[in-house]
């Protein structure tokens, strides 16, 4: 009987549902909710027969249902949907179509409506489930990354053979990354219940996206901090292992820790170089032309002459800029004539250098030098230059006499050695060879030193002459005549230096006659080269006198122009 009554009631209820007017604004889900709400106000008798009927109805529809059966809830327990327009229309339709009076057929529709409510869950529940699932996935990923970083740390510590205290420090670094991940998961689980019950699709999607964004940010932070900690840990342990195994690394590390300024380093290097050079000079005096030329103050006088020449050149240019017309043309012609004298006499000096150099001697050079300075009308005495020339000629003559005596002794000893045994000859020959080598070194050293000294004194003399031409002339003399006298003076200096270099090479050849060419030829070539350099320095200093003579000519012309 109960089965037949249920079928009739179900068919009657379906008829009522079909007879109700269909409206576009009321969907099927809303009808189901309205029926359930209308029935929930009626008092339902709690008899065991009704519960059995419910279970039978649910089991009969198990093939078509997906979700588990949901028991009817009170109207107060249901939360209203967020979409206000839909709920108002739905309530209005419910009030118009369903009455709240108790009807005998209302129990069976309640079961069917509950079954329909289970069949179509609210759309917001799917988004909420997806949000919690995404958060749990990201949380598990961050936890996996954290555990991976700690595993990298442990493996690095094991490979670097860290034991004892170092292993304890690595264990202390692990909780930082391990504690950071559970915090993120707890935060994610705390956020889950608050955001899980959205009732509309838009709010659920927004909640899910915000939750995923927060989890991604926290996961990124944990990954970055964990990675940096792991790299720092590996780097420190690697440096410690290298320092323990390599003693040189400790030394370089201590040197790198020192902060030394560049000036201090340069000062220390300069002091060390000075000490090294001082030790070399005390032990053995080297035959370096540049160093010897600087010792005799030749370089300082050459630089001073260059400064004086540059100043004179600037004065000439400024004075020419202030003139115009005929005065400018006349002055230019005079200056060009002085320049032509310098250029013409330079070629004559090169042609007559060899012939005059062979004829002149030390005394003749000193006499000629004094006469030329007197013609310039300058109060300059070549005392230092004359002394240097005299010393050079004296030691050359002494060396030649010593060499001749040594050659005679060697010839006599050779005749005596022929009568003696071969055993007694070997040590004596070794001693004589040592004496000869010392003589060659002394001659070479004296040659280079004499050339450097004579050249330095010549440049010093030209510097003094330039100063006296500008400021200390006793009598006025035309610049063209002064230029001719200076050319003669410079030519005499160059010829004297050339003759000295040839005498030095001759003495070297005589002393090293029994030596091999590999030993003798470099010395002779060096002496000839330094002799050519000496003449070049003197000629360059002479060219620096041209602006000085031009300024002197301008000064004399200005004095004559004044009344």
UniProtKB/Swiss-Prot annotation:
InterPro entries: DUF719. The modification Phosphothreonine is found at residues 185, 189, 199. The modification Phosphoserine is found at residues 120, 196, 202, 261. The keyword Phosphoprotein applies. GO terms for cellular component: cytosol; Golgi apparatus; nucleoplasm. Keywords: Coiled coil, Cytoplasm, Phosphoprotein. Its main location: cytoplasm. Residues 343-367 form a coiled coil. Residues 1-84, 165-206, 411-436 are annotated as: Disordered. Residues 166-179 have a biased composition (Polar residues). It holds the Pfam family DUF719. It is found in: Cytoplasm. Residues 56-68 have a biased composition (Low complexity). One of its GO terms (biological process) is gene expression. Belongs to the FAM114 family. May play a role in neuronal cell development. This is Protein NOXP20. It comes from Homo sapiens.
């Amino acid at each position: 009987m109960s089965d037949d009554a249920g079928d009739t009631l179900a068919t009657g209820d379906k008829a009522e549902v079909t007879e109700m007017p269909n409206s576009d604004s009321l969907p099927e889900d809303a009808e189901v909710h309205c029926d359930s709400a209308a029935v929930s106000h009626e008092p339902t008798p709690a008899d065991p027969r009704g519960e059995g009927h419910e279970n039978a109805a649910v089991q009969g529809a198990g093939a078509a249902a997906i979700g588990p059966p949901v028991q009817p809830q009170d109207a107060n327990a249901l939360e209203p949907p967020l979409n206000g327009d839909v709920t108002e229309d739905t309530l209005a339709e419910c009030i118009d179509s369903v009455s709240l009076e108790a009807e005998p057929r209302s129990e069976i529709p309640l079961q069917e409506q509950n079954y329909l409510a289970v069949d179509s869950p609210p759309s917001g529940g799917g988004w909420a489930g997806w949000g919690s699932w995404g958060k749990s996935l990201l949380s598990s990923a961050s936890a996996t990354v954290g555990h991976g970083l700690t595993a990298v740390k442990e493996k690095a510590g094991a490979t670097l053979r860290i034991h004892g205290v170092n292993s304890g420090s690595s264990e202390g670094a692990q909780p930082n990354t391990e504690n950071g991940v559970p915090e993120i998961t707890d935060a994610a689980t705390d956020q889950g219940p608050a955001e899980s019950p959205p009732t509309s699709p838009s709010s659920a999607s927004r909640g899910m996206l915000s939750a995923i964004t927060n989890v991604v940010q926290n996961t990124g932070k944990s990954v970055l901090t964990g990675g940096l900690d792991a790299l720092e840990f590996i780097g420190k342990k690697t440096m410690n292992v290298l320092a323990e195994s390599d003693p040189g690394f400790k030394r370089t590390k201590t040197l790198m820790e020192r902060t030394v300024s560049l000036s201090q380093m340069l000062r220390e290097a300069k002091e060390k170089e000075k000490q090294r050079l001082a030790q070399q000079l005390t032990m053995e005096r080297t035959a370096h032309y540049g160093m010897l030329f600087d010792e005799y103050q030749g370089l300082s006088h050459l630089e001073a002459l260059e400064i004086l020449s540059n100043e004179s050149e600037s004065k000439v240019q400024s004075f020419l800029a202030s003139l115009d017309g005929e005065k400018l043309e006349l002055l230019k012609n005079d200056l060009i004539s002085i320049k032509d004298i310098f250029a013409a006499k330079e070629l004559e000096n090169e042609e007559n250098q060899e012939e005059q150099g062979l004829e002149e001697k030390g005394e003749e050079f000193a006499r000629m030098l004094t006469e030329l300075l007197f013609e310039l009308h300058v109060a300059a005495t070549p005392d230092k230059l004359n002394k240097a020339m005299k010393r050079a000629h004296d030691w050359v003559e002494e060396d030649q006499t010593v060499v001749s005596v040594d050659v005679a002794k060697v010839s006599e000893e050779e005749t005596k050695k022929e009568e003696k045994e071969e055993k007694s000859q070997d040590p004596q020959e070794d001693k004589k060879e040592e004496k000869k080598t010392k003589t060659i070194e002394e001659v070479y050293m004296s040659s280079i030193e004499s050339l450097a000294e004579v050249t330095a004194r010549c440049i010093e003399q030209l510097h003094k002459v330039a100063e006296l031409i500008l400021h200390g002339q006793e009598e006025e003399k035309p610049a063209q005549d002064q230029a001719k006298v200076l050319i003669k003076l410079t030519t005499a200096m160059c010829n004297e230096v050339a003759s000295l270099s040839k005498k030095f090479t001759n003495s070297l050849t005589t002393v090293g006659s029994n030596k091999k060419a590999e030993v003798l030829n470099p010395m002779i070539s060096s002496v000839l080269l330094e002799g050519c350099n000496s003449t070049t320095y003197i000629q360059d200093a002479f060219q620096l006198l041209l602006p000085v003579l031009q300024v002197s000519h301008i000064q004399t012309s200005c004095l004559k122009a004044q009344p």
